């Protein structure tokens, strides 16, 4: 009888140990991201084969701001193990609210810059601008469309660029001048680029658009091999996107493996075509059209001293008042 009891106890302990091991060894990793996150089937399969983990379907939670705010609201019971897509304008919110286990890791970047329609300017005999500061000039009246900084991350990034470049007491006059010079404000990037921009969908009325330094890589004329647009790579806003392990994640080890994979050359090399961003690893070669027509900006505004978190809403409200001529 004693041997039987001992055997049962041993079996119970062994079973509990196995159950504990199973509980401590998750077989999947969940990712929360912004809406633009893309990972190819081949890359997904490569990660899963190397790690033994399955990537669960991505929880796409909106733009960088919406993503960050939703993760703050669910930080005690996170919706994922790893986050991708918090950018440098919302990194402070993530850190302040303690949603990240460890540090945010830069994965990619994009430069918010103005683009112009080369054909339009050549046809009209107008010299294209070399800086957004010039857009207040009368010869550019009624030619520019931007995204609303209260509804668009692209627009908000550029608002920050004007504040960083012109100062907290100087940016207002530039926007007032742009209002008086007939600037068009679109709700988001897709509306501005594909509807309002003359070279986006071909039917717009504005030959200057707030977009990205990478955009000319996607307007190459197959017949000539040349791009029909150009980026004004002067005083752009560099938007950096991060990944991080979410605090209270069910599989933090798996999350770290996925972040390491995002830094590997295969994932980095896929970023331009997949998400229209530059790899943070500068040793990774860019696609041919990117290297030729869409180099990253060498001139971007230093916004490191701006307190995005404390003043974001005030700046947005002040911008709204300016554009409504209040």
Q: Residue spans of the language-model regions?
A:
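A structural signal for short loop-to-beta-strand junctions that line the ligand-binding cleft
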Residues: 78-83, 99-118, 132-134, 142-149
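Early extracytoplasmic/lumenal segment of secretory-pathway proteins
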Residues: 21-93, 201
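C-terminal capping/gating helix-and-loop segments adjacent to ligand/active sites or protein-protein/ligand interfaces
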Residues: 269-326
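Ligand-binding pocket segment of bilobal, Venus flytrap-like solute-binding proteins
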Residues: 161-234
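Short, low-complexity disordered leader/linker segments with a strong preference
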Residues: 1-29, 326
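Short beta-strand->loop
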Residues: 101-107, 133, 207, 220-237, ...
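A bilobed periplasmic-binding-protein/Venus flytrap-type ligand-binding module shared by bacterial periplasmic
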Residues: 115-120, 163, 239-254, 270-274
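Periplasmic-binding protein-like
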Residues: 139-150, 262-285
